[in-house]
Design a protein with these regions (language model features):
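Extracytoplasmic gating/loop element in the C-terminal half of outer-membrane beta-barrel translocons
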Residues: 161-253, 257-259
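Short loop/turn motifs that connect adjacent beta-strands in outer-membrane beta-barrel proteins
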Residues: 42-49, 62-67, 240-254, 308
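Single conserved hydrophobic/aromatic residue that forms the stacking wall/gate
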Residues: 2-13, 306, 313-316
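Outer-membrane beta-barrel and related beta-rich outer-membrane complex signature
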Residues: 6-7, 11, 60-73, 164-189, ...
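Conserved small-residue
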Residues: 23-29, 33, 40-135, 175
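Flexible, solvent-exposed coil segments and beta strand-coil junctions
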Residues: 11-20, 118-126, 205-218, 276-281
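Membrane-embedded beta-strands that build the outer-membrane beta-barrel scaffold
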Residues: 1, 33-41, 49-57, 141-147, ...
Length: 316
């Protein structure tokens, strides 16, 4: 007995056996440089001035994205958030997207002419589609000085950050509920001034247009440029001949140290270093950050002479 079987196989349904896959999302170009200059402008037997300057800058550009990606959202993008971090061809890492005021061809804000929001600015970018800034600075600089006179030493450190934008959702939330200083002043005046235009509907402006985490991102973007006195320390080292007379002490140094003393210049009404986190998806975002700590400290550094072996045994 012979059994004969014949089968035909048509096209197989091309369903991929996975929900997600990893791809090389794009091509990002980074270009940067760093310069450090050390100098001793003054050097005498009693007085010395040493200084060091560090200057750095970095630029990045998204050259290409994966063929299936028009943009890559790597931060919050829901309706309840007024910003999104996106990668777009031609853009940069750190670009912040959100909502902005509608503007005419000359760059002037367009105002609504009818409805409940008549007289209030028009807004575009629902879904966070308008680029409103980039969190990265154009450059950063640190400059320190050390002045020494006999046993005294004074150290100063200046930090300068130039450029970059930061979004304050703290200010947006406070404005929404009318508990910020700017809303109090606006209520007292009876109007808000927006780029030279007077708006009489103060409550409507803050509550219905710009305020809150779903408000106008552009309105709460601040320049992160700042110059601060980062650290100051004053040291005094006692003369060696004084220490020798004690027969116990080898060195004795007293020091006063202060950090985050003050800003010499800043545009934002808060510390631009107070970002939500250092992760890529939260660069340049400030949300109810704790105030910067200013620390003051005093230290005493003591070193002792080594006791002789027979003296050590005698005291044991």
């Amino acid at each position: 007995r012979d059994d004969v079987e014949s089968r035909g196989l048509g096209d197989v349904y091309k369903r991929q056996p996975y929900a997600y896959r990893y791809v090389n999302a794009g091509d990002i170009q980074n270009r940067g440089w760093e310069l450090t200059v050390d100098a001793t402008p003054v050097l005498t037997p009693d007085f010395t001035w040493k200084t060091s300057l560090n200057f750095s800058s970095n630029r990045n550009k998204i050259k290409e994205l994966h063929e299936e990606l028009k943009e890559l959202v790597y931060g919050p993008s829901s309706f309840s958030s007024s910003y999104a971090m996106k990668l777009v061809k031609g853009g940069s890492i750190g670009d912040i997207y959100g909502k902005a005021f509608v503007r005419d061809a000359e760059g002037n804000i367009v105002y609504q002419t009818e409805g409940d929001h008549k007289g209030l600015p028009a807004v575009e970018g629902e879904g966070n589609t308008i680029k409103v800034g980039n969190a990265n600075p154009r450059f950063i600089m640190g400059w320190n000085h050390t002045f020494s006179y006999k046993g005294f030493s004074l150290y100063l450190l200046l930090d300068w950050r130039y450029g970059g934008k930061i979004l304050s959702q703290t200010q947006a939330e406070m404005d929404l509920y009318g508990v910020s200083q700017v809303t109090a002043l606006a209520r007292d005046r009876g109007y808000v001034t927006l780029e030279g235009q007077q708006i009489d509907n103060v409550k409507g402006f803050y509550k219905n247009i710009v305020g809150g985490r779903a408000g106008v991102t552009e309105y709460y973007m601040y320049d992160a440029t700042n110059l601060r006195l980062r650290e100051v320390s004053l040291n005094y080292t006692f003369p060696k001949k004084w220490m020798q007379k004690t027969k116990v002490l080898k060195d004795l140094q007293l020091a006063f140290v202060a950090r985050n003393l003050c800003f010499l210049y800043k545009k934002a009404p808060f510390d631009p270093d107070l970002v939500l986190s250092t992760g890529n998806d939260n660069q340049g975002i400030e949300v109810f950050g704790m105030p910067t700590t200013r620390s003051l400290g005093f230290t005493v550094t003591v070193s002792y002479t080594h006791l002789r072996a027979h003296e050590t045994r005698r005291h044991l």
